[in-house]
Amino acid sequence: MSALRSVAGLLQRWLLPARPAGLYDRQLVVLALALMAVGLVIVASASIPEGIAINNDPFMFVKRHGLFLVMALGISWFVLQVPMARWQHYNGPMLVLAILMLVLVLLVGRSVNGSIRWLPLGPFNLQPAEFGKLALFVYLAGYLVRRQSEVRERFIGFMKPMAVLFVVAILLLAQPDLGSVVVMFVTSLGMLFLAGARLGQFIGLILVGVSAVVTLVIAEPYRMRRVTSFLDPWADPFGSGYQLTQSLMAFGRGSWFGEGLGNSIQKMEYLPEAHTDFVFAILGEELGYAGVLGALFLIFALSFKALKLGHQALVAERLYEGYLAIGIGIWFSFQTFVNVGAASGMMPTKGLTLPLVSYGGSSLIIMMVAVSMLVRIDFELRQASAQARVREVS
């Protein structure tokens, strides 16, 4: 018990340190870079067979992933220079741009596996849904500041952002992309609840949302197959349950400490999407449950610090920054829950990436932009606190 208390104390001191005099929270940066490093290593291992099969180049995907990392870091550096007041001021145009991109992808987008989710930009493919997530949360944080009393006191104030979400959801479902819709819905509900929306409205919308998801699943045979295969994948291990059974076999082979980095069998064309949606299964096979717990701790710590930062911003009466930071924390944690749940058989597959780990340029860049926003929020809070102390002294 004393050892457990020591570990708990160590984690508490690391996750909840006294705010240092530095310019920003270095732990946020370290956590994000650590996740990106884990992703680079696992993508490099998981994508080798796919790269050979497509282009006879075992490092095809890891070279692209490395380029995405460089782009993500470069764009993040630019985002760090942008004051949060700018994001608050331009949240409306940002959402309009996201909606226009979602319309454009339906008109000229690239179809992959029956889904039209990508805009071809030369050698790159842009996924507007990823930008749409961030744009919606940036807009919703601004709305909650502008209409806080209306959200709390009037039903129409609660429903206006839900109407915006409905428009975005219709465009996403036309691709189709139910996974992104679910992430947006859950994150938006969390932000509205923390802004003081009435519990009855909140519960009613949850029931409507669950009913809508059930209807969408029943209406599409491929979604119904995903649900039935999730409930009993071994009933059709070479058909609808194939991907999940292969993923479960990867976790089983990994056991506690894994087969060793690069020694995965399931990535050898057995497990589809091994370097994207199911990269977590390959991580489990090669690094075992120890590696799984390590990766989950990094994501948990990043999400926890985002939520804690949001709380600090709300206490400091910086409402926009507080709502946005909390939204980012909910987004990261829920998307991780869905991705890990799909890979481990706890949830139907949704086609969502593991934050900062899975292969995918759009997801990686947008999530690093979100992390940069968190760092900027922390910087501005520290700056305001330092200025307040100077005024007190003078």
From Swiss-Prot:
Please give the family membership noted in the entry: Belongs to the SEDS family. FtsW subfamily.
Q: Please state the pathway this protein functions in, per its UniProt record.
A: Cell wall biogenesis; peptidoglycan biosynthesis
Q: What organism is recorded for this protein?
A: Aeromonas salmonicida (strain A449)
Cellular component aspect of the GO annotation: cell division site; plasma membrane
Keywords of the record: Cell cycle, Cell division, Cell inner membrane, Cell membrane, Cell shape, Cell wall biogenesis/degradation, Glycosyltransferase, Membrane, Peptidoglycan synthesis, Transferase, Transmembrane, Transmembrane helix
Which stretches of this protein does UniProt put in the Periplasmic compartment?
49-64, 110-123, 176, 220-279, 344-354
Q: Which residues lie on this side of the membrane: Cytoplasmic?
A: 1-27, 86-88, 145-154, 198, 301-322, 376-394
Q: What reaction is this protein's catalytic activity?
A: [GlcNAc-(1->4)-Mur2Ac(oyl-L-Ala-gamma-D-Glu-L-Lys-D-Ala-D-Ala)](n)-di-trans,octa-cis-undecaprenyl diphosphate + beta-D-GlcNAc-(1->4)-Mur2Ac(oyl-L-Ala-gamma-D-Glu-L-Lys-D-Ala-D-Ala)-di-trans,octa-cis-undecaprenyl diphosphate = [GlcNAc-(1->4)-Mur2Ac(oyl-L-Ala-gamma-D-Glu-L-Lys-D-Ala-D-Ala)](n+1)-di-trans,octa-cis-undecaprenyl diphosphate + di-trans,octa-cis-undecaprenyl diphosphate + H(+)
Query: Know the name of this protein?
Result: Probable peptidoglycan glycosyltransferase FtsW
Going by the entry's taxonomy, the superkingdom of the source organism is recorded as Bacteria
**Mode of membrane association:** Multi-pass membrane protein
Molecular functions per Gene Ontology: lipid-linked peptidoglycan transporter activity; peptidoglycan glycosyltransferase activity
InterPro entries the UniProt entry points to: Cell_cycle_FtsW-rel_CS (IPR018365), FtsW (IPR013437), FtsW/RodA (IPR001182)
Q: What function is annotated for this protein?
A: Peptidoglycan polymerase that is essential for cell division.
